[in-house]
């Protein structure tokens, strides 16, 4: 079995390198290349099926259990992933009208993320790949955010962004400005030196008693606010790092 491992080389850019099990990391096939992708880095269990670069299905199970705690509880998240991963994968394959035997490879989020949550997805993907005798491709989920611009459905009008381009990567746990020169060549130009934008918003929402998740709530209130109410000085620091 071929397992493609990801080595971070520049910024967050991974390159697929083969393990000693095989001297190539390329999927060779005369048939359409069909990949099952599994994501479990935080509190959403997701599975998608891609065929020759076209999205056939995308299924996500969210976890409402964290709302009572005002944030994601890692232990509860990993347990919920264990309950959700089988039905989510089954539904993704069913929606794509793809059998397990049709799969060319399985891709799974290796990190960054919550250790317990990642372990569920990686263990499931590894076991499934071994059982089917197909390659397992480990993926950096931040690169996945950036390359999401290239995902498209069948018959969808699609124009991929030209290289190089600048990407503002904002998620719950990461906020970065990334220069993308190629799908496997990326450079971090600047990033938050403390909390990510999502973390800052959720913390503010919790402190003010607005509930979780805080993003939709604060966004709604911000639209009703006065953007000139507070005057902030312009930052004058070296580099492009910033702080929330």
Predicted segments with their positions:
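A short helix-loop
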Residues: 29-33, 41, 58, 161, ...
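Short, acidic/small-residue loops that bind anionic groups at enzyme active sites
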Residues: 125-146, 194
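N-terminal beta-alpha supersecondary unit
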Residues: 31-102, 108-112, 141
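Short beta-strand scaffold segments in enzyme catalytic cores
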Residues: 45-50, 167, 175-179
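Short beta-strand segments
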Residues: 37-38, 107-109, 140, 166-171, ...
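Short Gly/Thr/Asp-enriched flexible loops that form oxyanion-binding sites at enzyme active sites
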Residues: 108-132, 151
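Conserved phosphate-binding catalytic cores of ATP/NTP-utilizing and phosphoryl-transfer enzymes
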Residues: 29-31, 139-165
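N-terminal polybasic/positive-inside topogenic patches
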Residues: 15-18
């Amino acid at each position: 079995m071929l397992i493609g491992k990801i080595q971070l080389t520049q910024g967050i850019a991974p390159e697929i390198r083969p393990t000693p099990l095989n001297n190539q990391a390329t999927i060779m096939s005369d048939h359409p290349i069909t990949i099952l992708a599994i994501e479990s880095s935080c509190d959403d269990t997701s599975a998608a099926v891609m065929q020759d670069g076209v999205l056939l299905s995308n299924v996500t199970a969210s976890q409402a259990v964290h709302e009572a705690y005002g944030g994601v509880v890692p232990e509860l998240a990993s347990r919920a992933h264990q309950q959700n991963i089988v039905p989510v994968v089954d539904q993704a394959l069913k929606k794509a009208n793809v059998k397990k035997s049709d799969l060319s490879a399985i891709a799974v989020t290796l990190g960054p993320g919550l250790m317990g949550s990642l372990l569920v997805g990686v263990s499931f993907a590894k076991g499934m790949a071994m059982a089917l005798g197909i390659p397992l491709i480990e993926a950096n989920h931040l690169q996945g955010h950036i390359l999401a611009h290239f995902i498209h459905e069948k018959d969808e009008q699609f124009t991929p962004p030209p290289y190089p381009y600048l990407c503002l990567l904002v998620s719950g746990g990461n906020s970065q400005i990334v220069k993308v020169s190629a799908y496997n060549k990326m450079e971090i130009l600047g990033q938050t030196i403390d909390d990510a934008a999502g973390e800052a918003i959720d913390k503010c929402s919790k402190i003010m008693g607005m509930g979780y998740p805080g993003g939709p709530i604060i966004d709604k209130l911000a639209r009703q606010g006065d953007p000139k109410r507070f005057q902030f000085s312009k930052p004058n620091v070296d580099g492009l790092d910033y702080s929330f």
